[in-house]
A protein has these predicted regions:
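Transmembrane alpha-helices and immediately adjacent membrane-cytoplasm interface residues
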Residues: 5-39
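Alpha-solenoid helical repeat scaffolds
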Residues: 81-85, 101, 114-119, 135, ...
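TPR/TPR-like (Sel1-like) alpha-helical repeat modules
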Residues: 108-109, 142-143, 155-180, 249-262, ...
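Alpha-helical segment of the N-proximal tetratricopeptide repeat
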Residues: 40-78, 85, 123, 199-209, ...
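Alpha-helical adaptor scaffolds
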Residues: 87-92, 100-108, 113-125, 195-196, ...
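Structural motif corresponding to the intra-repeat A-B loop/turn of tetratricopeptide repeats
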Residues: 59, 93, 127, 161, ...
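TPR-repeat structural position
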Residues: 62-63, 96, 130, 164, ...
Length: 371
């Protein structure tokens, strides 16, 4: 009986305790209800402010938009979006300090670090501070090495600054992000410009120093670009100008033996450390394989001029003019005829050149010939 009485008493006490705890819980819940209601109301207000702020920004009411968006950033469920839009509104009012502050707030959210950084870079570019934008983008590119938007924007800034070494160094990452073909034009432009910059680099008073720098750079050029005719022509041309004619000639001959391209023979015009007679032998060998090729004929004519072989030069230019109506050949021919004292032929060559131009000019009224 005692044991049973104890069990009954314990059960009663437990039931009473449950009732009391339930009552206390309900009381606490009811006491917190106004707090939750207040929070819900604040979030609803913040959402309306975010929506209204965005619409005001679209309508060009930047000051009103900024005020609404800042309030939404402080109380709403979407603080990241609110701070980013507030930064845009402040930037449009040229309030740099405020826009930077809002972007810092956005950066505090891990998800907003990259987009806030991109906006900082864009604002810096808009304000005329490309170096500041570049520094910001470099940090972002290290944080997110595969982010396409960051990499492309960074590349555009480097290209606008003509920092070809940095852009060429960035190209492997760009190609991994976008694929081999997407950035091929930018890569080609960058390496062509870097070759030119190196060949004309200030501080090198001697051609030997610049030529050596150029050769070192050529080793770093990607293999597929070393097979690009325009790239080969640019590099070989600079080598020739800097006294590396033998290397330039070997490079041109090697490439042409694999694949012919009319952009390569003119490199021989810049070679001064090989005799014109030897160069003419090479050119005449190419002409035997490709008779009437205007690029080779014009180059041969100019090399013949260097050798003071006037008759031979005239023959090459005439052949080029007759085979292709080359404007360059006609101009060279007119100049040579004039120098030889044959004004009549010089005038005829000039008129043939002019007739070519007339086909490219718009049809417009002209004065009648005077009687």
């Amino acid at each position: 009986d005692t044991t049973l009485g104890f069990v009954v008493l314990a059960a009663l006490l437990t039931a009473v305790a449950i009732v009391i705890l339930t009552l206390l819980g309900n009381a606490a819940w009811n006491a917190l209800e106004p707090v939750r209601a207040t929070r819900r109301w604040k979030k609803a207000v913040a959402a309306r402010r975010l929506r209204s702020g965005f619409l005001q920004l679209v309508d060009g009411e930047q000051e009103k938009a900024e005020r609404l968006l800042v309030a939404a950033g402080e109380d709403g469920d979407w603080p990241l979006l609110a701070w980013l839009l507030a930064a845009e509104a402040a930037q449009e009012q040229e309030n740099v300090e405020a826009s930077q502050r809002y972007l810092e707030n956005a950066s505090s959210d891990r998800r907003g670090q990259l987009v806030a950084g991109l906006m900082k870079a864009r604002f810096a570019l808009d304000d005329g501070y490309p170096e500041q934008a570049r520094q910001e983008l470099k940090v972002l590119a290290d944080l997110a090495p595969r982010n396409k938007r960051i990499l492309r924007t960074y590349a555009e800034v480097l290209e606008s600054q003509k920092d070809w070494p940095a852009l060429c160094a960035l190209m492997p990452r760009l190609k991994r992000a976008f694929g081999e073909g997407k950035e091929s034009r930018r890569e080609r432009r960058a390496w062509l410009a870097l070759l030119q910059e190196t060949a004309r680099k200030p501080g090198f008073n001697d051609a030997d120093g610049r030529r050596e720098e150029l050769r070192k750079l050529w080793k770093d050029v990607p293999v597929h670009l070393k097979n690009d005719p325009a790239m080969v022509a640019r590099y070989a041309g600079f080598l020739a100008q800097l006294g590396g004619g033998k290397g330039a000639l070997n490079l041109v001959r090697e490439h042409l033996s694999r694949e012919w391209d009319d952009r390569l023979p003119p490199v021989l015009e810049a070679i001064d450390d090989i005799s014109p007679d030897d160069l003419l032998q090479v050119l005449e060998g190419w002409l035997a394989e490709r008779p009437g090729n205007a690029a080779v004929l014009i180059t041969a004519g100019r090399v013949a001029l260097k050798a003071r072989l006037w008759g031979k030069a005239q023959g090459f230019f005439e052949a080029a003019a007759n085979s292709s109506q080359s404007a360059t050949a006609l101009a060279e021919l007119s100049r040579l005829y004039q120098a030889l004292g044959d004004s009549s032929k010089a005038q005829k060559a000039f008129e043939r050149r002019l007739q070519q131009l007339e086909g490219q000019l718009p049809a417009l009224p002209m004065p009648e010939k005077s009687l």
